[in-house]
Structure formats: C-alpha cells, structure tokens
Amino acid sequence: MKRARPSEDTFNPVYPYDTETGPPTVPFLTPPFVSPNGFQESPPGVLSLRLSEPLVTSNGMLALKMGNGLSLDEAGNLTSQNVTTVSPPLKKTKSNINLEISAPLTVTSEALTVAAAAPLMVAGNTLTMQSQAPLTVHDSKLSIATQGPLTVSEGKLALQTSGPLTTTDSSTLTITASPPLTTATGSLGIDLKEPIYTQNGKLGLKYGAPLHVTDDLNTLTVATGPGVTINNTSLQTKVTGALGFDSQGNMQLNVAGGLRIDSQNRRLILDVSYPFDAQNQLNLRLGQGPLFINSAHNLDINYNKGLYLFTASNNSKKLEVNLSTAKGLMFDATAIAINAGDGLEFGSPNAPNTNPLKTKIGHGLEFDSNKAMVPKLGTGLSFDSTGAITVGNKNNDKLTLWTTPAPSPNCRLNAEKDAKLTLVLTKCGSQILATVSVLAVKGSLAPISGTVQSAHLIIRFDENGVLLNNSFLDPEYWNFRNGDLTEGTAYTNAVGFMPNLSAYPKSHGKTAKSNIVSQVYLNGDKTKPVTLTITLNGTQETGDTTPSAYSMSFSWDWSGHNYINEIFATSSYTFSYIAQE
C-alpha cells in the first residue's frame, strides 16, 4: 500500500497517514506519538524535533547554545562565570540583592520612604520642616523673624539699645543715670534732700502751714483766709468794688468819670468838665439850644414840628419823631424807615451803610445795561424797530439756524468747498422743521464721473450745539438768521436745535429710529431718483476726530452709471425731528 504525502498544514506524524481526500485507514493503529506539538516531518518521511534558539542538535544529541559568561560545570549544570559584587548599603544573598536601611529610612508599599516626626514632614514628595513664629524660612534657610529692639547682627541674636539703656564691655545690659538718679546700690534710686523723703517706697514732701495737701487731688496748695485768694495758680489779695490793681500789680482805687486821683496829694477829688462847673458845688452850664432849666429846676428840652413828647405807661417822658405811617414811613427798631410795599424791595448795599430801594421783578422782566426795567425775551421773541415785542423777527431770528438760502461753496463732499449745502433748522416747539439740498460745484461730482454712486456729508456739534471744526460744513456759513444773511457774531448756544439724545441715542451703531430714509431727485428730474438717508446722532468717530455731543449725517446714493456727466444737484427735502431741551 502506498502512503500519501501529508499536507504540511495538516501534518499528522502518526503512521499510517491519511489521504487528503479519502476515508481514514482502517483498522486504526495506535503508535506511541499522539501529538504534533514539538515534532515535525523533516525531511519527508523522517520524524524530527521542531527546535528554536538556543536549542540545537550536536552529534545527534539535543544541545544548548551558550554565550559569553555561561558554561557547564562537571555535574552538567549551567553556571555563570560573572560574579556580581555589591557595596553597602546593598547586600547580596544567595539569589537576591537587598538594601540595608535604618531609621529614619523605611520601606512602605515596596518603596523606600523617610519616616518623619514633627517638626519634620513630607509635603509634595519633599522633606520639609514646619515652623512657627518667630522661626521662619527665608532663602531656603531657617531663620528667626525679629522685631525691634531685637535684631540679628553678625549671625547672632542681638538687642538694640538707646539711652539710658546701654551694654557694658561684658555684654551686660545696664542703665546710665544722672543726678538725682543713681545706681550706686545696684538698683535705680534717687538722691534725696529735705524736705523730700521716702516712705513705704514712695516719695513724700514735708510741709507746714499755710501749706497743705488736698484730700481729693493730693495736690500741694496754700490755705487762704479772708482777703486772700488763689487766682490762676497765683496767690493774690481779694478786692471788690472800686479797688483793683494797676499794671505793676499794685492795689489801687479805680475811679470813673467825675472823679480822679490827685497822685501828688494822694486824695480823691471831683473832676468835671464842661458843661459842668464844680468850683464850690456841682452845676450844669447851659448854652443856646433846646436844653433849659424849667421852673421846677429840672433839665428840660424845647422841641418843634416833627417831634413830640411821648408819655410812657410809667409816666416817663420820651422825645419821639412824629411821622405819618400812611405816607410810606415806619419805624424799623429805633430808626425811621421806608415802608416798602409789593413790587419794592431793598437791594444789597453797593457801599457801606447803604441799602437802596429798588423795584422787585419776577418772571419776564429784567434790568438792562442802563438799569432800566425791560421785558426778558426768550427764544423767538425780539423787539422790532418801534420797540414792540414781536415773534419771529427776520432781522433777529433766534428760531432759525441756517446756511442762508443761496450760500457760497460752504462744505466738502470729496474736497474742500466743492459743494453748496443749503440747510435750514427752524424750531417749532419741541420739533425741529428742517430743509436740506446740495449742489456740487467742482470735483468728481461736477459732473459725476467714473463709478461714483454716492455722496456723504457729516456735521458735528459740541455739548452747546456749536458746530465743530471737524464737520464737513464750514462754521463761517452757519448761524442764526438775520434777514437773508446770518448773525455777524458766532453763536454760543443752540442746544434747543439739536437731535434729542433720548429719542436718538448717541452711539457708533445706527438704530432704526435714528434714520430718516426718503427719495430726492437729481436736478429735480423725477426720472432720476436718489436715495437720501439722514442719520441723527449716529456718526462714527475715530480716535483722531474730536468727539461730538450731537451730529447729523446726510448720504445720497444712486444705482447704475446713468448719471455720469450730470451735475450732482438734489431737489430740496423737508424733514423733522424731536429737539433736545
């Protein structure tokens, strides 16, 4: 029977071999080989071992490849010729290398660690030391934090001293003393002399009458009797009535008018002057005037018109001014005064002791430069040539800000003064009625050239409504109306003409209600529409542009190139907006 060559992938070393496609050979034989693990048929028909490095066959026997340092001893055991040596703290046993350790080193969870006790601790895988004031760590060194008078000098803790404390040559802290203080007994003491003494460790003062110590304040004072007192810590004589002291502290008799001291004869005498006479007795000398001695020997007074003698409730007589209160006069305390009625008042004095009478004015009135009372005019009111109050005086129109109806070139669209802007703002209560148109006189818009399809103009105002110099409109052509021209003097306030900040907030972004969008016509031709966009308080300003408080911008846009070679001139457009008040 011819055996089939087995497939290498399905090798079965048990004989007889099965064919790849036929049925198994019957009867089955049970050879001593039952597993292909470790065996192979190589060459074909020969059973051999399947080997891998370092196993080989040598002289028909299984052998082991050995590299440098390996050999077999006489008993056939595999040995190593390289002997490992160690040094402390490493220790070699029969089959291991160990690390010899002692405290504070220990092995925890198969890792070498350091056992630490306070103040040492392990934090962040680092052995560190806990410290408490005054100990501290500075520049990675343990140090002591000091505060005066303690300090560190030359690496040593030292004490800073100042007089009277000092240190001796033996580095001993001591105190220096000057008389009456002494340290002769080894302690700080005082040298005493009568009447100062010590008792129970306290200083005392020996004293006798009239000196005594008060019970409440323990203060040494002087006991005083009648006629003597203590004034401002000084002992002095008590005086009353006409007795007093002169500038040198001498006691003296104080005298008033009619009396004087005769210092030569040291006597008190009667001293009188006119109209008194004291030759022998005191008399009153009377001259010409209202004073006289009446029949009862009393001093009396003569009086005439405008004066009268008033008898008081106690029957005393008083001379008073006889005035008529019905004629605008009155008494103000003790003075005659004008009884000012409604419409009159006293103004602030312009000079000392003056308080002029003036007219009291209310709303709608004021004083002019000539101190005359005139009506106070508000916006829109003025005087005409006859001096009457009028509304909307064309020669002094404070209700209209404009550029005049036929201005010279006054603004820039692309270049300086390349266009004429006609802008009229008329105040109508809380609304501003406005009219705008523009005419290009030179540049790329006169006529329209190239791809130009828009024109823009921005006017900016400060917080007082005054036109800023960085506007596209020249301030020289912008003022209140005066006839068909403008005022000759620049205005200083026109806030009432500005767009309302609450209705049109000042922002860099345009809001819907801040824009007025409509259509005008080029040269008034209805077949040539131009879109006009008016933006209130919405202009964008860069860092090099003076910020504005209020603003208006005008943009004219058209599509296509149908307007090339046309002069840019728009029809007038009228609009309104809410005014700032």
Curated annotation (Swiss-Prot):
Keywords associated with the record: Capsid protein, Host nucleus, Host-virus interaction, Late protein, Repeat, Viral attachment to host adhesion receptor, Viral attachment to host cell, Virion, Virus entry into host cell
GO cellular-component term (any): host cell nucleus
Chain intervals for the UniProt region annotation (Tail (penton base attachment)): 1-44
Shaft repeat spans: 45-59, 60-75, 76-95, 96-109, 110-124, 125-139, 140-154, 155-170, 171-185, 186-200, 201-217, 218-232, 233-248, 249-265, 266-279, 280-296, 297-316, 317-333, 334-354, 355-370, 371-386, 387-392
Chain spans, region Disordered: 1-23
Induction or repression: Expressed in the late phase of the viral replicative cycle.
One biological process term in Gene Ontology: symbiont entry into host cell
Location within or outside the cell: Virion; Host nucleus
Spans annotated as Shaft region: 45-392
Region (Head): 399-581
Residue numbers spanned by region Spacer: 393-398
Main location: virion
Keyword Repeat: yes
Modifications the protein undergoes after translation, according to the UniProt entry: O-glycosylated; glycans contain N-acetylglucosamine and may play a role in fiber assembly and stabilization.
Disulfide bonds: none
Annotated family: Belongs to the adenoviridae fiber family.
Function text: Forms spikes that protrude from each vertex of the icosahedral capsid. Interacts with host coxsackievirus and adenovirus receptor CXADR located at the cell tight junctions to provide virion initial attachment to target cell. The fiber protein binds to CXADR with a higher affinity than CXADR binds to itself, thereby blocking the cell-cell adhesion function of CXADR dimers and leading to local disruption of the tight junction. Fiber protein present on neo-synthesized particles may thus disrupt the junctional integrity in order to facilitate further neighboring cells infection.
Additional remark text: All late proteins expressed from the major late promoter are produced by alternative splicing and alternative polyadenylation of the same gene giving rise to non-overlapping ORFs. A leader sequence is present in the N-terminus of all these mRNAs and is recognized by the viral shutoff protein to provide expression although conventional translation via ribosome scanning from the cap has been shut off in the host cell.
SUBUNIT field: Homotrimer; arranged in a triple beta-spiral. Interacts with host receptor CXADR. Interacts (via N-terminal tail region) with pentons.
Protein name, entry field: Fiber protein
Provenance organism: Human adenovirus C serotype 5 (HAdV-5)
